[in-house]
């Protein structure tokens, strides 16, 4: 039996090596995701929220035409909708990038 090997050809050393390689790829991906952004919009583009690949909001843009001091609730709803969409889009981007590394396996706790 080879060093680190088990019956049936299972080799713990190869498994550890693959896990370390995956960790390096994930770290690189996390750094790249910091530079990528996605956006969410509402009100036909009147409100736009931008999030990065770490699910952090980086900007919110509000068209002045949608600002009405007598109807703050509508503006709040538009901002909330845009932010939620941006965060969902960030989640999808992260999942897509992770699938490239993990081969589609869902590994709990990575993100």
Swiss-Prot record:
Compartmental location: Cytoplasm, Nucleoid
Matching InterPro entries: YbaB-like_sf, YbaB/EbfC
Broad class of the protein's primary localization: cytoplasm
GO cellular component: bacterial nucleoid; cytosol
Gene Ontology MF terms: DNA binding
Record's keyword annotation contains Cytoplasm: yes
Record keywords, A-Z: Cytoplasm, DNA-binding
Pfam families, sorted: YbaB_DNA_bd
Taxonomic superkingdom: Bacteria
Function per UniProt: Binds to DNA and alters its conformation. May be involved in regulation of gene expression, nucleoid organization and DNA protection.
Similarity annotation: Belongs to the YbaB/EbfC family.
NCBIfam families, per the entry: DNA_YbaB_EbfC (TIGR00103)
Oligomeric form and interacting partners: Homodimer.
HAMAP family: DNA_YbaB_EbfC
Name used for this protein in its record: Nucleoid-associated protein TTE0040
Native organism: Caldanaerobacter subterraneus subsp. tengcongensis (strain DSM 15242 / JCM 11007 / NBRC 100824 / MB4) (Thermoanaerobacter tengcongensis)
């Amino acid at each position: 039996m080879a060093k680190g090997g088990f019956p049936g050809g299972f080799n713990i050393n190869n498994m550890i090596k693959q896990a370390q390689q995956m960790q390096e790829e994930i770290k690189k991906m996390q750094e790249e995701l910091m530079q990528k952004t996605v956006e969410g919009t509402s009100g036909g583009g009147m409100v736009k929220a931008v999030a990065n690949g770490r699910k952090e909001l980086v900007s919110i843009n509000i068209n002045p035409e949608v600002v009405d001091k007598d109807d703050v609730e509508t503006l709040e709803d538009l901002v909330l909708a845009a932010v939620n969409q941006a965060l969902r889009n960030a989640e999808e981007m992260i999942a897509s990038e992770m699938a490239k590394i993990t081969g589609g396996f869902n590994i709990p706790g990575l993100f």
